[in-house]
């Protein structure tokens, strides 16, 4: 029997109940209340810093969220050394079944006598479980027929639910056409009707099992990150990568499906990668951005130093990301060493800076905002740190930076190792393994580079816009953001400059040409309908009258002959 003290952390949204419970438990011998809280931040901080033996929590916490049951499942896996006990109002059978199935150590209804509560907590502390309402949980076992049909219903409902999620993600795509949206809406109605029909065909006891399964497999609640604090050994964090200021990118990467699609009309270097490798490269890019921000904070770089060193910082981010990704997946140990890869990166760095990295917009404002807390200026409006608009635009800029860094990493691989067999097998999609497909992919990229250089980029400079890539749960999409680009416009020469002149001439002439075409078109319509049309009508009328007269004369002759 363990002689370690019984330590408890209490989490409940009712402060009066929490205070009374702490006071009563504090009088008990061998029981120590280490902490208490009412928010997700409090819960995470208490578990990481105090490492209690028991977490006493209300499963209805937090009441403003959809469900705390997935949170309990996550806590159980992230902190296996902490035993979770429920202290709440009476639960339904399916909720009790879910709690017992996922390994909750004890359940105490609110109103349980303090002596019984302390006794149950001590039993849990010594490795036992405590279910005062156990007789209500143990329902009669399923019959043979129910055991046979239950997997069919469960798997069918699971497939319907997965299909519904895919349809809903498809409906979230901004560029979806009206016809496609109508199609997916119909598909959604069909799936919901099938789901309702299957659920109504379930026997009553299997409905209870299904509800319990839904509780166990609901979407996991992600605990928000807390400030760094001393932690005891053996305690693990709940979130895989606390994304600090870049919350949206981290959340999307965690929620993103494996089949991340390029939903833009732009060919991206990432398109050649396998879905898992594509997602991994984006995740590494996010981590590299976070690492760079932390390093710059540690170096205490000043706002005056940042603009002149920004390109070097981004280049170092690209170099580190490329080396990490290549070393993790692409290094054929028999042919290349990391030293050789580093030398190739150093040679290629000026080229990638000139062709790709220097063109990434809003990097300096993003770093100023994240490092020094300066307001983010968008459309001549300054949004302070912490505001909703500043968070949205900083997330957008960060996502575009990460995606462009990932694309630049693939540019390096495609230029030096495009046809290397080991690298193709490790990274490329199966449909892109042949040399012909790789050559076609590279040619498509090369054509787009030239098209962008001589048409798209001058056009966007003239229109004072930047095209940014960002992530959605369905995939990668684009958006247009306004920004003054007068200095770039004055620096255009040769073909790009001529493109702006063509656009300006088109803007100047098109309204006049349109009006002339409209006038001529109206004249032609009048001529064809009022003149030619009437003339043709008169001719047709004469022909019909002639046919009628001839027919009448023939009838008259027939009557006379008769």
Swiss-Prot record:
<comment type="similarity">
    <text>Belongs to the ycf55 family.</text>
</comment>
<dbReference type="GO" id="GO:0000160">
    <property type="term" value="P:phosphorelay signal transduction system"/>
</dbReference>
<protein>
    <recommendedName>
        <fullName>Ycf55-like protein</fullName>
    </recommendedName>
</protein>
<dbReference type="InterPro" id="IPR051015">
    <property type="entry name" value="RcsB_transcriptional_reg"/>
</dbReference>
<dbReference type="Pfam" id="PF12452">
    <property type="entry name" value="DUF3685"/>
</dbReference>
<dbReference type="InterPro" id="IPR022552">
    <property type="entry name" value="UPF_Ycf55"/>
</dbReference>
<dbReference type="InterPro" id="IPR016837">
    <property type="entry name" value="Uncharacterised_Ycf55_cyanobac"/>
</dbReference>
<dbReference type="InterPro" id="IPR011006">
    <property type="entry name" value="CheY-like_superfamily"/>
</dbReference>
<dbReference type="Pfam" id="PF00072">
    <property type="entry name" value="Response_reg"/>
</dbReference>
<dbReference type="InterPro" id="IPR001789">
    <property type="entry name" value="Sig_transdc_resp-reg_receiver"/>
</dbReference>
<feature type="domain" description="Response regulatory">
    <location>
        <begin position="7"/>
        <end position="125"/>
    </location>
</feature>
């Amino acid at each position: 029997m363990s002689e370690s003290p019984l330590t408890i952390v209490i989490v409940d949204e009712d402060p009066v109940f929490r205070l009374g419970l702490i006071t009563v438990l504090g009088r008990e011998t061998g029981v120590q209340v280490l902490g208490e809280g009412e928010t997700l931040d409090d819960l995470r901080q208490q578990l990481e810093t105090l490492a209690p033996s028991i977490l006493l929590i209300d499963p209805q916490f937090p009441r403003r969220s959809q469900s705390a049951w997935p949170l309990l499942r996550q806590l159980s896996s992230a902190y296996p050394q902490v035993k979770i006990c429920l202290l709440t109002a009476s639960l339904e059978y399916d909720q009790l079944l879910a709690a017992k199935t996922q390994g909750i150590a004890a359940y105490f209804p609110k109103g349980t006598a303090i002596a019984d509560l302390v006794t149950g907590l001590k039993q849990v502390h010594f490795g036992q479980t405590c279910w005062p309402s156990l007789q209500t949980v143990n329902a009669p076992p399923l019959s043979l027929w129910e055991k046979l049909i239950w997997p069919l219903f469960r798997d069918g409902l699971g497939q319907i639910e997965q299909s519904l999620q895919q349809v809903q993600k498809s409906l979230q795509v901004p560029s979806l056409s009206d016809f496609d949206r109508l199609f997916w809406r119909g598909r959604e109605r069909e799936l919901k009707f099938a789901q309702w029909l299957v659920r109504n065909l379930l026997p009553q006891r299997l409905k209870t099992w299904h509800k319990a399964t839904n509780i166990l497999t609901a979407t996991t609640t992600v605990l928000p990150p807390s400030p760094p604090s001393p932690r005891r050994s053996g305690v693990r964090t709940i979130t895989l990568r606390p994304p600090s200021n870049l919350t949206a990118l981290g959340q999307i990467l965690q929620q993103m499906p494996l089949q991340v699609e390029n939903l833009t009309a732009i060919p991206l270097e990432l398109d050649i990668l396998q879905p898992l490798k594509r997602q991994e490269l984006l995740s590494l890019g996010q981590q590299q951005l976070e690492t760079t921000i932390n390093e710059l904070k540690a170096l205490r770089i000043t706002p005056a130093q940042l603009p002149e060193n920004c390109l070097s910082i981004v280049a170092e981010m690209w170099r580190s990301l490329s080396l990490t990704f290549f070393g993790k997946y692409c290094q054929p140990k028999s042919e290349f060493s990391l030293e050789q890869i580093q030398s190739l990166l150093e040679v290629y760095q000026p080229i990638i800076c000139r062709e790709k990295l220097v063109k990434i917009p809003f990097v300096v404002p993003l770093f100023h905002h994240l490092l020094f807390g300066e307001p983010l200026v968008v459309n001549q409006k300054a949004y302070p740190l912490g505001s909703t608009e500043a968070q949205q635009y900083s997330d957008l800029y960060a996502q575009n930076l990460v995606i462009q860094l990932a694309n630049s990493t693939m540019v390096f691989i495609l230029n030096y190792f495009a046809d290397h067999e080991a690298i193709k097998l490790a990274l490329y999609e199966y449909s892109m393994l042949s040399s012909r497909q790789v050559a076609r992919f590279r040619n498509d990229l090369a054509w787009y580079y030239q098209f962008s250089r001589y048409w798209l980029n001058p056009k966007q400079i003239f229109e004072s816009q930047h095209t940014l890539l960002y992530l959605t749960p369905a995939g990668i999409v684009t958006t247009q953001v306004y920004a003054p680009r007068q200095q770039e416009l004055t620096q255009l020469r040769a073909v790009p400059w001529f493109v702006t002149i063509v656009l300006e001439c088109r803007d100047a002439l098109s309204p006049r040409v349109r009006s002339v075409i409209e006038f001529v078109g109206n004249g032609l319509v009048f001529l064809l309908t009022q003149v030619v049309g009437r003339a043709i009508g008169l001719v047709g009328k004469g022909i019909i009258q002639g046919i009628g007269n001839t027919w009448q004369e023939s009838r008259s002759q027939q009557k006379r002959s008769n």
